[in-house]
Swiss-Prot record:
Pathway: Quinol/quinone metabolism; 1,4-dihydroxy-2-naphthoate biosynthesis; 1,4-dihydroxy-2-naphthoate from chorismate: step 5/7; Quinol/quinone metabolism; menaquinone biosynthesis
Organism encoding this protein: Salmonella typhimurium (strain LT2 / SGSC1412 / ATCC 700720)
Membership in a protein family: Belongs to the ATP-dependent AMP-binding enzyme family. MenE subfamily.
InterPro entries for this protein: AMP-bd_C, AMP-bd_C_sf, AMP-binding_CS, AMP-dep_synth/lig_dom, ANL_N_sf, MenE
Function of the molecule: Converts 2-succinylbenzoate (OSB) to 2-succinylbenzoyl-CoA (OSB-CoA).
Protein name: 2-succinylbenzoate--CoA ligase
A Pfam family reported for this protein in Swiss-Prot or TrEMBL: AMP-binding
Lineage of producing organism: Bacteria, Pseudomonadati, Pseudomonadota, Gammaproteobacteria, Enterobacterales
Reactions it catalyzes: 2-succinylbenzoate + ATP + CoA = 2-succinylbenzoyl-CoA + AMP + diphosphate
EC number(s) on file: 6.2.1.26
Amino acid sequence: MTFTDWPWRHWRQVRSQAPALRLNDEVLSWRALCERIDVLAGGFAAQGVREGDGVLLRAGNQPRTLLAWLALMQCGARVLPVNPQLPQTLLEALVPKLTLRFALTLEGENAFSGLTALQIQKSTAAYAVAWQPQRLVSMTLTSGSTGLPKAAVHTCQAHLASAQGVLSLMPFGPQDDWLLSLPLFHVSGQGIMWRWLFAGARMTVRDKQPLEQMLAGCTHASLVPTQLWRLLANRAAVTLKAVLLGGAVIPVELTDQASKQGIRCWCGYGLTEFASTVCAKEADGSDDVGAPLPGREIRIVDNEVWLRAASMAEGYWRDGKLIPLVNDEGWFATRDRGELNHGRLTIAGRLDNLFFSGGEGIQPEEVERVINAHPLVQQAFVVPVEDKEFGHRPVAVVEYASQAGDVNLAEWVRDKLARFQQPVRWLTMPSELKNGGIKISRRALQQWVCENCKN
């Protein structure tokens, strides 16, 4: 589909009174949504926001976060969403390089002295710049797992290409409703928003509450396996029929249970630089992440995954300039180790993470996939610690589900991992490393483990 106007305005023309968005329990039609966006955009314009301006949006998921984002885009702004829990020291290091003029803080304190503070205010004068699909609209921080995060910059066209690829595989129609279950400061949350806008379906945004309550009336959701395990175990009365799973290995037992309750499950592989999902498939219990979606291309060069796609970012933003993502051959080298078999991609892990123990190569992600398959594990990481005899030994750091109790993971992995792969020590994830993001810094984790293993 090709849009000739902002997607929400397009759907106002096509199906004006159809339900578009549910904000807590308030349902807005496409016409009503456009009216909300117009007056908010007018308010931002009255405060000086103009086309091309960089705006920092510090907020978690809530109804006014989404409306503000759409209104800022309609002003032509380049939006940088940030996690309210990011340390101020990190933001102080990042912000000066990102050419920002304004900051809209909906959670936390507005501590950006060099940026003009914006307020949510309505204006009787609606405001909108012309639709240009190639305009830069978002700056999304990479995970920063190995250093200072970079800001990947996407156009509307790239986001829509990402959405189109996913929806070519996963049905999402006008009568469906996708819960905004992931944060908009993460590319996975943005992916939900753009799929909704591409499909002209419905999306639900609710203030934070138990997942079962947030899912009321929703047909689609993006979840991690632990969340789906919990829903099924609690025999929750949900209206779900489709789930996009991410963040861990997908046990076939989980998808079989979901299927018995009428829920189809998909999984895949994505990157911030590619506006979310690159490969996907309906979950089938195999280790691969599926085939490239339409508009995506994959090469394997020296065991490294190379990508290019219509959804690729224009570059990394630094000091008012776009730093190219691609190499001299026009491909993005991911630093992920993988292989293609019959057109389907299998990811082994990060090339940078491989280490050796007694001469045996250990790819942490392969061990993590096994540990993460345990239904009481929220997430797990494996890092090397120095050892005089073996060179390095694997240590596991685990975040358990709240109801886990005593879990003997060492015994559980004994027949699932080679002996050299089995962690020699099991540590519980410290709260200070969970800064509210979806990904945890491996560098910080490594430092923490080394300190604890000295004791």
